């Protein structure tokens, strides 16, 4: 079968960093190829070389059998290569049709927009994807899943033969993911080639035909998915065996550090639990169960309407995140790009931002040498891959950004560390490193609350697990009692709480 798109021997270097070295990718008609690798493996750089955002230093790009160089996203798009980014590029205040044909609206012979034709053409594109809504609907009124379908329709409007999807299910529900997979199968049947970039093993084995593996900017292998197992694919990605994905530290917790009694707030109803020194408390539940809301009430980011919180035997009241920090409670947000990091600032500035009081003199000036030493120590401890501490954090991979976010929390010397989805969007290798860090914090006596939608992660890392359902606590289990079936039953409200006090 002749490839629609071939990239061979691609090199790309930046000052101090060799991003790609001999990288390769083949995309075939009617097949879905997964592009996988750890964060920083070169996947994003390869896509930018492909679409003309970056100029390759060496190598060839063959499009429909002819050697080609694209001068930018517009030229690759017009040639028939569409890309759907992780962050959707839509304008909520415009209709679906206006978004699809933005900048290339249909006009009549008088130079005015031909709305009737534009909406009719947009409706045809939606019908191709078997979507039930019309193109006169505002994009802002759609769910994230439906907005993604609009992005696909927009790509199809360019008659795209190859469609690149970057982490397409990151913000989707299970139902929306299944809808997306139906559309991908339809696109396959039309003879289009799909590049599917994802960290989610389950999805790769469900929807992809082939897989290309990158590691450290190099092409490692191209295989048929059917010939692989999850373990063999992960080994190719990280270059080593992952014998123990969840390295649990078997150390008995100490005395009670945090006690929460009858806590209420937005989306949180009458929740009580305890947390011990040197303990990892897992928090499980379905999307919308109130897990993040509970953590924000505890930390002070959302108002507490009633209930009590005691820390080391003393009552604490957190009316703001500053109160949480002052009392030794640190919250690492699930949305690091919106709540956790300032992407335009450097690694150093992000890491020390909430701990500047430790580096300040009486007059308010900073002890820069102390700040730099602390940041340097954390970069080394956390194995943060960055050219320097002055690098803009937005240029780091997701796993390294997450390490910086956690390091920033630890710089404030907390007693309680709340990690909300700490490995979301992080590759398997970086996940293992984060788990090892969490165990290190536990060994040092830090009390950790681990909120996660990944059940194996909660089961593998936690000493004890509580489950949320519709704002209430629906279950509490020891490590020995907890199974995926038990947690799921509690998550859907089918189990009464098991008190382990």
Curated annotation (Swiss-Prot):
It is a peripheral membrane protein. It is found in: Cell inner membrane. Transmembrane segments: none annotated. Part of the ABC transporter complex RbsABC involved in ribose import. Responsible for energy coupling to the transport system. Residues 5-241, 252-495 form the ABC transporter domain. One of its GO terms (cellular component) is plasma membrane. It comes from Shigella sonnei (strain Ss046). This is Ribose import ATP-binding protein RbsA. ATP binds at residues 37-44. Keywords: ATP-binding, Cell inner membrane, Cell membrane, Membrane, Nucleotide-binding, Repeat, Sugar transport, Translocase, Transport.
